[in-house]
C-alpha cells in the first residue's frame, strides 16, 4: 500500500482531533442544563413556533418512561409517514421518471430501516424511489432518526450527571434543538463542500447520453449532495444511488471522499468531549475517546493491510498486486481506482464502526480476512466510535459492565462516576447486551435452514454464510451496509431484517433510558483511595477487553464457519 494512503489516514486523525473538541463543547452547551443556549437569537423563535404548534411545554421535563414513550411515539409516526409516502409515490409530485408505488414488503423494510437509523436498502435507490420520496421521506428521516439517537444519549448523560433527580429532560425539546442547531448547520456546510467536489444537486430525471459506441445511456439526476451530507453526518448511510458512495455522483474526488469520511466520524467522536464536559470531568471524555480511537484505528489498519496484500489466488497465478508507479496495488476488485485499497479499507472500518453503513467499495469483493473486519467491527456493537448518540450509549453500557466486573474482582460495590451500580442496572445491561446477538444469530440460523432464503445467495459455501451473517449483523446493529451478493429484496429477508432492525433499535434504547432513570435518582458517593478510577489507562484497557471478549466469544463460532474457513481454503 502506498505512503499516500497512510498519509490520508494520519490526516483524518489529525483533522478529527482538531475539530471534535470544538464541536463537542458546542454539543455540551446544547444539551446542558444552562438556560441560555448557543444560537438562541436565530433558532429560538423557530423553536418557539414549533413548540406552540405541537403543544409542547419547553419548561417541563420527563421521567425516563415518558421520555421512552415519546421516542416510541415519534418513531411510529415516522414509520407510518415514510411507509405512506413510499406506497403512494406514484401519485405524488417530483417524480420525473414516473416511478410506481413501492411494493408493500420493500416499503415496510425501507420505512423501518430509515426510521431506525439503519438505512439498509434492499432496493436500487435511483431505480425505485422518486425525488419526492428521497427528499421528504428518506432525507427527513436521516435528520430525525439520527437526532433521536443523540437525544437518548443526552438523557443518559444527564442521568449520570444529575443527583437525586427524577427527570432526564424533554425529548421534544431535545429533538428540535438537535435538528435545528446541530444537524441543519453542519449539513449545509458539508453539502456546499460536496457540491464543490462534483456531487450533483438538481431535480432532473434521467438524461439520455450517447456513448462512444453510439448506444444511448441513461444518466440519473437528483438532489444528491443535500442527502449525502446528512446521511454521513447522521451516520445514516443510505445511498441515493444503488452503489452508494462508490458512485461518482455521490463521491467524485479524493477530497470529497475525505470530507465524507470525516463527516461519518466527527459527531460520534465529538460526543466524547460533550460527555466529559456534561459530567464535569473532561478526563472521562478523553477516556472514552481513547477506547473508541484504539479500536477504530486497529480495525482501520487491519482492513487496509488485509486488502493491500491482495488476493492470494492471484498471487499463485503470478499476477502483480504490489504498488507500482501505475497502480495502487492490493485487492482492487470491487473498488474505485480513484480511491484505491487504502481509502476503501479506511472507509470500511469507519462505516461499520459507526452505524453509518455507506460504502465507497463493495465489501462482498473484499478478501476473506478483509471482509471479516467490517463484519467483526459491527459485531462488537458499533461502539468504536459508534453512531450518532447510540454508539456512546453502547460504550457507556460496556463501561458500566467493566466497573461491575472490576468491583467483583476486589469485593467492592461497583461505581461509575460516583453512582453505585446495583442489580437493577445490571439486569438492564444484560438485556442490552443480549438483544442484538439473539436477533442476529436467530434470524441467520433460520435463514440457513430455509431453502428459499438460501436461494438468495450468489455464492455457495463459507462466503454464502458470510453474506447471510453480514445481512443480519448489519440489520441488528442498525448499520445498513451489505455483502451485496445476497439478494435481499425478497419477502422473507425484507421482513426478518426489518424485525431485526426494530429489535436492534428499541431493545437497546429502552434499557439505556431505564438505566439513565435509575442512575439519575441516585446520589453520588465521595471519591476515596479505594475508588476505581475510570479515567486512567487501566480502565481504558478493561473496557476494550470487555468489548472484545463479549463480541469475540459471542460470534467467534459464526466467524469461524464463514470468513475464517474461507481464508483457510484460499491458502
Swiss-Prot record:
**Pfam families per UniProt:** KdpA (PF03814)
InterPro entries linked: KdpA
Localisation per UniProt entry: Cell membrane
Q: Which domain of life is it from?
A: Bacteria
Keyword annotations for this protein? Cell membrane, Ion transport, Membrane, Potassium, Potassium transport, Transmembrane, Transmembrane helix, Transport
One annotated GO biological process: potassium ion transmembrane transport
Q: Which GO terms describe its molecular function?
A: P-type potassium transmembrane transporter activity; potassium ion binding
Show the stretches that span the lipid bilayer.
Answer: 7-27, 66-86, 137-157, 188-208, 255-275, 286-306, 390-410, 430-450, 497-517, 538-558
- Which protein family is it in? Belongs to the KdpA family.
Assembly with partners or alone: The system is composed of three essential subunits: KdpA, KdpB and KdpC.
Role this protein plays? Part of the high-affinity ATP-driven potassium transport (or Kdp) system, which catalyzes the hydrolysis of ATP coupled with the electrogenic transport of potassium into the cytoplasm. This subunit binds the extracellular potassium ions and delivers the ions to the membrane domain of KdpB through an intramembrane tunnel.
Q: What is this protein called?
A: Potassium-transporting ATPase potassium-binding subunit
Please report the organism this UniProt entry assigns to the protein.
Mycobacterium tuberculosis (strain ATCC 25618 / H37Rv)
Lineage at the top is: Bacteria, Bacillati, Actinomycetota, Actinomycetes, Mycobacteriales
Q: What is the name of the gene encoding this protein?
A: kdpA
Amino acid at each position: 500500500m502506498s505512503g499516500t494512503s497512510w498519509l490520508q489516514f494520519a490526516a483524518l486523525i489529525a483533522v478529527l482531533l482538531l475539530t471534535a473538541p470544538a464541536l463537542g463543547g458546542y454539543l455540551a452547551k446544547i444539551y446542558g442544563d444552562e438556560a441560555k443556549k448557543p444560537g438562541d437569537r436565530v433558532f429560538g423563535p423557530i423553536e418557539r413556533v414549533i413548540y406552540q404548534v405541537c403543544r409542547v411545554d419547553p419548561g417541563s421535563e420527563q421521567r425516563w418512561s415518558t421520555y421512552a414513550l415519546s421516542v416510541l411515539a415519534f418513531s411510529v409516526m415516522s414509520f407510518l409517514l415514510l411507509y405512506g409516502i413510499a406506497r403512494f409515490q406514484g401519485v405524488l409530485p417530483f417524480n420525473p421518471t414516473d416511478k410506481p408505488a413501492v411494493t408493500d414488503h420493500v416499503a415496510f423494510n425501507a420505512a423501518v430501516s430509515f426510521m431506525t437509523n439503519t438505512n439498509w436498502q434492499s432496493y436500487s435507490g435511483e431505480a425505485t424511489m422518486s425525488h419526492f420520496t428521497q427528499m421528504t421521506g428518506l432525507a427527513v428521516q436521516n435528520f430525525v432518526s439520527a437526532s433521536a439517537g443523540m437525544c437518548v444519549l443526552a438523557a443518559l448523560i444527564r442521568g449520570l450527571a444529575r443527583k437525586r433527580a427524577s427527570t432526564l429532560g424533554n425529548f421534544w425539546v431535545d429533538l428540535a434543538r438537535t435538528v435545528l442547531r446541530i444537524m441543519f448547520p453542519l449539513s449545509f456546510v458539508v453539502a456546499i463542500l460536496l457540491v464543490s467536489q462534483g456531487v450533483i444537486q438538481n431535480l432532473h430525471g434521467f438524461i439520455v447520453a450517447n456513448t462512444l459506441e453510439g448506444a444511448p445511456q441513461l444518466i440519473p439526476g437528483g438532489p444528491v449532495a443535500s442527502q449525502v451530507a446528512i446521511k454521513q453526518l447522521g451516520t445514516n448511510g443510505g445511498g441515493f444511488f444503488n452503489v452508494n458512495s462508490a458512485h461518482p455522483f455521490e463521491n467524485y474526488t479524493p477530497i470529497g471522499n475525505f470530507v465524507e469520511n470525516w463527516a461519518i466520524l466527527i459527531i460520534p467522536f465529538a460526543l466524547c468531549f460533550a460527555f466529559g464536559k456534561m459530567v464535569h470531568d473532561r478526563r472521562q471524555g478523553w477516556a472514552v475517546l481513547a477506547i473508541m480511537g484504539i479500536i477504530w484505528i486497529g480495525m482501520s489498519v487491519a482492513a487496509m493491510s488485509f486488502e493491500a496484500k491482495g488476493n492470494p489466488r492471484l498471487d499463485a497465478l503470478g499476477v502483480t498486486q504490489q504498488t507500482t508507479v501505475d497502480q495502487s496495488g492490493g485487492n482492487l476488485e470491487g473498488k474505485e481506482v480513484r480511491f484505491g485499497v487504502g481509502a476503501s479499507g479506511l472507509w470500511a472500518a469507519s462505516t461499520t464502526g459507526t452505524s453509518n453503513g455507506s460504502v465507497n467499495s463493495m465489501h462482498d469483493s473484499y478478501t476473506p480476512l478483509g471482509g471479516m473486519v467490517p463484519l467483526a467491527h459491527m459485531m462488537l456493537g458499533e461502539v468504536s466510535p459508534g453512531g450518532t448518540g447510540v454508539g456512546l450509549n453502547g460504550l457507556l453500557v460496556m463501561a458500566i459492565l467493566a466497573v461491575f466486573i472490576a468491583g467483583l474482582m476486589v469485593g467492592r460495590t461497583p461505581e461509575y462516576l460516583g453512582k453505585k451500580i446495583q442489580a437493577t442496572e445490571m439486569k438492564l445491561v444484560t438485556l442490552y447486551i443480549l438483544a442484538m446477538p439473539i436477533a442476529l444469530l436467530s434470524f441467520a440460523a433460520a435463514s440457513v435452514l430455509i431453502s428459499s432464503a438460501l436461494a438468495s445467495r450468489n455464492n455457495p459455501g463459507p462466503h454464502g454464510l458470510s453474506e447471510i451473517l453480514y445481512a443480519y449483523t448489519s440489520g441488528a446493529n442498525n448499520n445498513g451496509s451489505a455483502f451485496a451478493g445476497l439478494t435481499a429484496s425478497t419477502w422473507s429477508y425484507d421482513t426478518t431484517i426489518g424485525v431485526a432492525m426494530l429489535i436492534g433499535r428499541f431493545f437497546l434504547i429502552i434499557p439505556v433510558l431505564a438505566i439513565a432513570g435509575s442512575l439519575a435518582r441516585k446520589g453520588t458517593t465521595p471519591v476515596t483511595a479505594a475508588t476505581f478510577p475510570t479515567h486512567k489507562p487501566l480502565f481504558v484497557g478493561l473496557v476494550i477487553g470487555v468489548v472484545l471478549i463479549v463480541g469475540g466469544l459471542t460470534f467467534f463460532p459464526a466467524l469461524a464457519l464463514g470468513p475464517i474457513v474461507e481464508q483457510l481454503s484460499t491458502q
